[in-house]
Each structure stands twice: as C-alpha cells, then as structure tokens.
Amino acid sequence: MMMREAFGSTIAELMRKDERICVLDADLANCNGTAGLRNEFPDRAFDVGIAEQNMASVAAGLSSVGCDVELLGVVPTPAVAYLVTKLGVSGGVMITASHNPKEYNGYKVYGEDGAQMSPEATAVVVEYIEKITDYFSVKACEFNEIKPQKGVKVLGEKFVNKYVKTLTKLSLSKKAVKLLGKDLKIVYTPLHGTGYTPVMKVLKKLGINVSVVEEQVKPDPNFSTVEVPNPENKEAMTLGVNLANKIGADVVFGTDPDSDRLGVAIRDDSGNFINLSGNQVGVLLTDYVLRRLKEEGKLPKNGAVIKSFVSTGMVKPVCEDYGVSLMEVPVGFKFIGEKIKNFEESKSNVFLFGFEESCGYLRGTHARDKDAVVASMLFAEMTCYYEYNKTSVYKVLNSLYDKYGYVIDKTVSIAYKGLTAMNEMNAVVDKMRSSTVKVDGFDILAVRDYLSGKRKGEITEKLEYSGINCLYYELVGGGFICLRPSGTEPKLKIYYSVLGSCEKDATEKIDQLTKGFEKLLK
C-alpha cells in the first residue's frame, strides 16, 4: 500500500514538472497509488483497460503502415473533429459507443475536412474491409515497436485548453454571465464519458457555477450507473435531477459519453424539473443565437441555419422572422458538416447554427460535427441572459409557442433482432413506398421519397438528396410523418410532428396521427 502511494506521488510530481510524461497503468481506477493521476492528468494518464487498449491498438496499427499518429486520450468527439482541421491532418478516429450501450462500441472516422466521412467515402472504406479474408494477415505492430520517426505523439492538456479557448470566443452574452453566472446553479453529469474536463473548463472560464454528479464523473466503459447513457432519456438524467433538487439548482446538463449530445432539464413555473426534447432545445438555441446576433448588429444578410429534415419545423418561422435562410439535410450531422464546407468554399452563406432532434447542436465552424461542449456553454449563458432580462428559459419557450403555434414532435422506434433485421426494416419501408397512405383526420400534401430523390405532390419535383431509404409525408396545415431505418442500430424510426392551436389541441393531434399511421404498418 505504502509503496503504491509513494510511486503515485512521485510520478505526479514528475508529471507536474514535465508535460511530456504520460502514464499507462492497468488499474488507475482502482489502485490507491495511481488513482489520483487520472483525476489530475486526464489527458496523460491512461488506464489500459477496454477503451485505452483499443486506442493504443489503433495507433499502433496506423503507425505500422507509415502514418504519424496524434494520440488524444479521453476526449470528446467534437474535439477530434476540431483537431483534424486545426492540425491539417488526413483524418481522425474516435472509438466510441456514443449514446448507446457498451455493446455498440465502434469506430467513427473523420475526413481531412473534420466532418464525418460522407456515404461515398464510407463506401470506399467498406470496400477495402470486405476485401480482407484473413484478419491475422493484416500488417500490424506492437505499441512498443513503433518507430520514432513514424510514431505516436501524445498531445497534452494544451490541446484541451486551445479547444476551450476557441469555444469561449463564441459566447454571446458575456455581460449577463459576468453579472449572474456565479449565482446560477447548474448540475452537470458527463454520464461516465469524456465531457467532464472540457465542459467544466469552459463553464468555469466564463464564471458559471457548476456542481457535478460525482458518481458519473470518471470515464467508465461499462456505464455502470445507467442502463443507456443517452441524455435524451429521462432515466439517464435521474441522478443529475436528484442532485439539483437537493442543492436547489436551476438547470441540469447531461452529455453522452463522447460528449456530442446534450440533454437538458429545467424548472417550470411550479419549480418542478422537466426534461426538454432535442427539438425544444434546438428551437430555444436557434432563437437565442439569432436574437443576440441581431441585438449586437452582427446578423449577416446571408446567414443560414441548418437542421435535419426530421427535426422540428418550428424553427422555420423563427428563421423567417430574423431574415435567415433555413436549410434541411438528411439525418446525420455529416450532412450539416458538408453544408458548412460548401458555404466556406462558395461564400454563399454564413453558418449560424445547426441542430438535430437527437440532441445534437453546433455553433461555430471550429468543428463540423455536433458539439455538446459548446451547446452547454450556449444554454448556460442563455439562462443567464434571460434572467438578466427578468424572464426565464421556460417562459421564453412558452412565448415561442404562443407566437408560432404549439408544435409537438414525437419519435417512435420499433426494434428488430437478428441478421435479417435490416431486410425486415427495408421491407416495411418498401411496402409503404408502394402504398397510398391515408390517415383519418390528416391530408397528405406531398410525399418525399429520398431513395428516388423525388417529391410528389401536385407536381413532381427533384430533391437535393437521393439514395437514402426514407419516406417523408408532408401534412396539410403543417407537420409531417417520416419513416426510415436507423443508421446506427436495428430500429425502424418513425418521426411525427403536428401543429396545434394550444398544447391540448396538439396533444390530441399527435395521438391521433401516431395511432392512425402505426395501423398502416401492421
């Protein structure tokens, strides 16, 4: 015991003096002597367990075929996207289960533009993988065999600090934060993932008061305190809400393990916590960003907001009121990243904000992927801004409903199992594609078939995107139904959206639409 403690304290002292020193240990999470190293040096102390073994193996494999590798350690997905463009490297790799259970741990790849690889580029990679018939014949090397001139460089904490500094430059309400940030009480949980260091750094740098859910701070590949580490789910936010009630906090943030999705819970007028949907957060942040840019005289004439087409249509009138273009893309933030790249090359538009209903948001062009760290900062300062203006986030949300109509968005997932799952899901979509859809109480304005790339209404029009197995039904009077197989898990996803005159009217409509359409699937 004493030897372990002496060993740990000596190494800690050396690491404080020399940022080049890194530690690889098999049990940092459990042993007494080195447990503190991971807390003090999260970017330089590696527990060579599940995640780090994968990370080191990938680094060694890339080096064995002549690649220089920048090893980041435990960092958020958007930080990888940021560094790809910052360093001008050929690509980036993130090993993550994202917001899914640990069984979904996988390999996320970024192109040299810092965006997730396009479907075309992904197809090329898959083609190479399928050519491998003997995995043991693939050229590889041990981590300790890497040649110095073609080796692995471990980036230090300076990288995280640069990332945080970049994000704080995107702040829109520094005056309100300076006055009220220290009084705002936020509870934050990284859900056993990568968000703790950057989220805490960016919020504290702005002077915002944050408390953390200690049980969920340490990176844990088993996600031990939750069934599914998805901040979209109310269950994943339970410990955070419990702590918030205990200490009287105003807001609860949760980031998924790779910190690209943000879940939020706020208090209503009765003081009870409500979990906001990704669509509600998307509308609030869109309105806030455009509002502040306009107030500061910085709203460009060619500004653009981008959303996936399954995300709420409530942002359309918001963008219209601010004179900003709203553009729709398929599901997957890579398509938003692709648009950002096109804007920069063509100078046609200035990117202002992007979001997906699945709790993914982005302000800024530092990354071409969703970023829960910058979203946390924006939501925190938005809360301060509205408090400074004698209102609240909850009141502003309801004022938007009063102004634009009450929109309810709902997503239903139907799970499939086994090797035939994809075929079964595609068969359901094909069946609906060949059918005339009629739902009692609703009229179909047009049908978008993203496989053929055609929109069929009174006239047939060409869509911007094609080759995607997705059907989208536009409803008369506002709203939609969208049907698509998930791209990350064996689930058929159905998205519903309705516009009502009030909450009661919209609730009745969404129930009627859901029941009516699901009858057609049987």
Features from the language model and the residues they span:
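Phosphate-binding and adjacent anionic-ligand microenvironments
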Residues: 245, 249-251, 272-274, 292-484, ...
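Short Gly/Thr/Asp-enriched flexible loops that form oxyanion-binding sites at enzyme active sites
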Residues: 104-111, 260-279, 315
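N-terminal small/polar loop signature for handling phosphorylated ligands or for N-terminal nucleophile
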Residues: 62-104, 204-205, 209-263
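Gly/Ser/Thr-enriched, mixed-charge loops and adjacent short helices
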Residues: 105-239, 243-244
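Alpha-helix C-terminal capping segments
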Residues: 40, 58-65, 82-88, 287-294, ...
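Thiamine diphosphate
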Residues: 1-64
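Active-site nucleophile and cofactor-binding loops and adjacent substrate-binding regions
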Residues: 25-28, 44-57, 69-78, 274-281, ...
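Glycine-rich phosphate-binding loop plus the immediately following alpha-helix
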Residues: 110-141, 279-303, 307-318, 372, ...
